[in-house]
């Protein structure tokens, strides 16, 4: 093994003076030595490489791996590295039933096959389904950080992530599979153990405003895809990365939220619905949203948020936390946000719900997804 000081310096120097790789590669697609898709970027723009350079101890294999990541140079001689990047799976975000303009209706079976349910174990060992989540790949699920902090405050711990759940009443007793009329295969709910979960390091609550309310959950095994289980797309492609999610006040921007949350407005409504519901929501003016959820000092509603809704009785509610706020682009569903917080009484006229803006966190997500798995 080598000391961090000497090897890190040597590697940085090596990366900086490597001028024989060819110019003009910056921001172009590339492939890491491990076969993972990536983008050719500056060293300082790649959190994955920076993490490697910060390691306390280096082995020879680390040096070889970093050398293999070089993908070109800039005109000034600075090195470019192939930074692993999340790539949507080819068939993500399927629009099974088309894009429907509705509000507060039951979903169709298999309509949002990326919906997942977080299950927590209480002190008495009873299992509770308590928050929604979104499947984004065979191994990763996204939800809200506050789902975990709220569970921890009650002495609960994460038990599993369930996919292919649609209607709790369809699986009464011990039945995990149910044959549904009109489908060739049964719908089979399945629970996956959690390998790790990464809460955003700067998550906090400021005067009721949840900031950086996002958690990445890695499953212990690959999810099996079928007609009832598939990932939603993330805003990483060229045609979606530049969409004005979270910053546009255009009321024509339309989202869809889904979850098992309460269907009754009011502070006392804290239960969950048996049936997976969906609701159509329009973008809400960000400046008005900031004033409604004004904080006395510090960080409040900002770039990391999307505000949507504001029409009486059309809102996400208790139990919807962690679930997806979705936008359809070209007939494909993308994860725009994560249900975060709102007014204590759901569905109040003129008051929107607030969602974590996924596009704002793509850099952090990519960094955490690839942390430690490529070296």
Curated annotation (Swiss-Prot):
Molecular function (Gene Ontology), one example? serine-type endopeptidase activity
Instruction: Indicate the enzyme's highest-level EC class.
Output: hydrolase
Enzyme Commission identifier(s): 3.4.21.-
The region annotated as signal peptide is 1-24
Q: Where is this site: Cleavage?
A: 100-101
What is one process in the GO biological process aspect for this record? proteolysis
Give the active-site positions: 146 (charge relay system), 213 (charge relay system), 321 (charge relay system)
Q: Name what induces it.
A: Induced by infection with E.coli or S.aureus bacteria. Induced by infection with P.berghei parasite following ookinete invasion of the midgut cells. Induced to some extent upon sterile injury.
Q: Null-mutant phenotype, please?
A: RNAi-mediated knockdown in the G3 strain reduces survival following infection by E.coli bacteria but not following infection by S.aureus bacteria. Following P.berghei infection, the number of parasite oocysts in the gut is increased in the susceptible G3 strain due to a failure to kill or/and lyse ookinetes (the motile parasite zygote that enters the gut to form an oocyst). RNAi-mediated knockdown in the refractory L3-5 strain results in an increase in the number of killed and melanized ookinetes following P.berghei infection.
**Cystine crosslinks:** 30-82, 40-71, 46-83, 131-147, 289-307, 317-346
Free-text comment on this protein's domains from its UniProt entry: The clip domain consists of 35-55 residues which are 'knitted' together usually by 3 conserved disulfide bonds forming a clip-like compact structure.
Please report the name of this protein according to its UniProt entry.
CLIP domain-containing serine protease B14
State the organism named in the record: Anopheles gambiae (African malaria mosquito)
């Amino acid at each position: 093994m080598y000391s961090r000081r000497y090897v890190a310096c040597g590697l940085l120097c090596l990366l900086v003076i490597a001028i024989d790789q060819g110019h003009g590669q910056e921001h172009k697609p590339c492939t890491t030595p491990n076969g993972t898709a990536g983008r050719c970027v500056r060293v300082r723009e790649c959190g994955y490489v920076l993490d490697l350079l910060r390691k306390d101890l280096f082995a020879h294999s680390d040096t070889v791996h970093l050398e293999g990541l070089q993908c070109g140079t800039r005109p000034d001689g600075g090195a470019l590295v192939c930074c692993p990047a999340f790539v949507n799976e080819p068939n993500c975000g399927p629009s099974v039933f088309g894009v429907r303009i509705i509000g507060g209706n039951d979903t169709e079976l298999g309509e949002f096959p990326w919906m997942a349910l977080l299950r927590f174990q209480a002190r008495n060992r009873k299992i509770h389904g308590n928050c929604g989540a979104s499947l984004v790949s065979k191994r990763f699920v996204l939800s809200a950080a506050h789902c975990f902090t709220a569970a921890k405050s009650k002495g609960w711990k994460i038990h599993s992530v369930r996919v292919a759940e649609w209607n709790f009443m369809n699986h009464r007793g011990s039945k995990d599979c149910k044959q549904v009329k009109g489908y060739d295969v049964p719908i089979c709910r399945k629970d996956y153990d959690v390998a790790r979960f990464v809460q955003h390091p700067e998550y906090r609550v400021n005067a009721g405003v949840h900031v950086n309310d996002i958690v990445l959950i890695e499953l212990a095994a690959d999810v099996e895809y079928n007609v009832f289980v598939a990932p939603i797309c993330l805003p990483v492609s060229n045609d979606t990365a530049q969409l004005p999610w979270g910053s546009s006040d255009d009321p024509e921007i339309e989202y869809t939220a889904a979850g098992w949350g309460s269907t009754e407005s009011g502070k006392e409504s804290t239960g969950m619905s048996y049936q997976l519901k969906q609701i159509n929501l329009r973008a809400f003016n960000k400046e008005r949203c900031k004033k409604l959820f004004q904080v006395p000092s510090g960080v409040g509603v900002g770039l990391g948020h999307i505000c949507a809704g504001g029409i009486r009785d059309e809102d996400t509610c208790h139990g919807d936390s962690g679930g997806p706020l979705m936008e359809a682009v070209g007939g494909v569903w993308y994860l725009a946000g994560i249900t975060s917080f709102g007014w204590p009484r759901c569905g109040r006229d003129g008051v929107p719900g607030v969602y974590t803006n996924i596009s704002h966190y793509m850099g952090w997500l990519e960094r955490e997804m690839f942390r430690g798995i490529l070296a």
